[in-house]
Structure formats: structure tokens, C-alpha cells
Amino acid sequence: MLWLDLGNTRLKYWLTDDIGQIVSHDAKQHLQAPAELLMGLTDRFERYAPDFIGISSVLGDDLNIKVSETLSRLNIPFEFVHVDANYPLMKSAYNDEQLGCDRWLQMLGAVDKTKRQCLIGCGTAITIDLIDHATHLGGYIFPSIYLQRESLFSGTKQITISNGTFDSVSQGITTQDAVHRGILLSIVGAINEISTRHPNFEVIMTGGDAAIIAQHVNRPVRLRDDLLLNGLARYFDHSKQS
């Protein structure tokens, strides 16, 4: 199988064997030209001879059409994920037309009917979703730590871009530290507040910035890096069965 995740800035792919083990995986910047990037990867895909391509995409219809045209040249069946608020594995209170495909698949990859879960995605945006025994209750969306920093730098003449790090939530004694620690604290504080309101929910974090943020959260955190892939596999496995 070939699994594709077409995000806002990056294309990720996983090639898995017959028992679901990953045999090849990579992530690349697509620069809003995912079809062209895929064209350069087709030789690599063909070497593994996948029998199906499952696709998660947050891109618009125009780019998805170009991706479809490129994939059609492989002569391999492919299908895009369609968000469904009434999906059997997880119901959602959310308007499915407004629920991002990648966010939904991350939840689908984590959902456990026996648990209450607080799933936090740490990518281009910070998403916090509450799932009660496979029912999505809704959630919150924040700018990521890097989007917040970029916004502050672009809107404030007195603060210039620097190479500071998001490594502490204690007060800063330089502007550089104060900016980075303030941004990190705003996100950590929100997560701590939400987890305090929902003490019986397991906290799960995923995404590129998860490890940075998790160490400052005041609850045990389970880190997962396989949720979107797991969600893709669950989605198409259930589709085949039904």
C-alpha cells in the first residue's frame, strides 16, 4: 500500500507491506506543487508495486485534480479520504465540511471506544480535540509556536527574528527569551487548563512539535507519531469491509 498525506506545506508518504509494516517513508516540502513532486517520486513508488493508494489531502480541489492526473499514470487504484461526521468508528459533533481531513484522521487513528481522550496535534496549527468513547465532542485550534513567533516578528518593529528556542516556560530576562517562553507558555497553559477541565481524559500528543510542548504539560502525556498513518489504514480497511 502507498499512503499519502498532502498537508499545507509538506507531502508525506508511507509504503507498507502486506502486514502493514512500513518499508519506506519520507516527508518533503511541496511548495504548493505536490503534483510535480509526486512525478519525481513515481519511480520510487513503482519499485514497491503498491496495489492501492490512499490519500489524505487538505489542499484545494484544483491541486487535488493535478495530483489525481499524476497518480493516474501509475495505473494503480487510488482514493481520497472524505471526512464523515457519522463515520461508524467515530461520531463527531463537528460540521464535517469544516473538519480538516488530517485532523479527523489523527483522531480516527487514536480513537478507542473504551476511553476518553484529549488528542493534541502539534503541526502548522495546534489542535485540541476531546473524544468521549468514540464520540468527538469538539475542540480548539491555536496558531503553532512558530506561527505565533512569525506573527509577532512581522507585526512588531522592535522585535527582530532570532534563533531562540522554545525550551522553557519560566520568565525570560531578554526579549528573545521572553518572546519564546511567552509563546510556549500560552500553549502549555491552554493545554493544562483544558486537561484540568477534563481530568478523566487521556492526553495524547502528535506532530512535529509534540515533544517540545509535552515536557511542560502538567499531566502524563502519551506521544504518538503514527496517528495519521493509522487513521488512513483504519479508514480504508473499514471502507473495504463495508
Swiss-Prot record:
HAMAP family to which the protein is assigned, alphabetical: Pantothen_kinase_3
EC number assigned by the record: 2.7.1.33
Keyword hit for RNA-binding: no
InterPro entries registered for this protein in UniProt: ATPase_NBD, Type_III_PanK
Location within or outside the cell: Cytoplasm
GO cellular component terms attached to this protein's record: cytoplasm
Binding site for substrate: 94, 100-103, 175
Pfam (any one): Pan_kinase
Entry keyword set: ATP-binding, Coenzyme A biosynthesis, Cytoplasm, Kinase, Nucleotide-binding, Potassium, Transferase
Gene3D superfamilies per the UniProt record, alphabetical: 3.30.420.40
PANTHER family registered for this protein in UniProt: TYPE III PANTOTHENATE KINASE
Protein's UniProt keywords contain Transferase: yes
Principal location: cytoplasm
Organism of derivation: Psychrobacter arcticus (strain DSM 17307 / VKM B-2377 / 273-4)
Record's protein name: Type III pantothenate kinase
UniProt record similarity statement: Belongs to the type III pantothenate kinase family.
Quaternary structure and interacting proteins, as annotated: Homodimer.
Gene from which this protein is expressed: coaX
Cofactor: NH4(+); K(+)
Lineage: superkingdom: Bacteria
Gene Ontology MF annotations: ATP binding; pantothenate kinase activity
Pathway: Cofactor biosynthesis; coenzyme A biosynthesis; CoA from (R)-pantothenate: step 1/5
Active site: 102 (proton acceptor)
GO biological process: coenzyme A biosynthetic process
Function text: Catalyzes the phosphorylation of pantothenate (Pan), the first step in CoA biosynthesis.
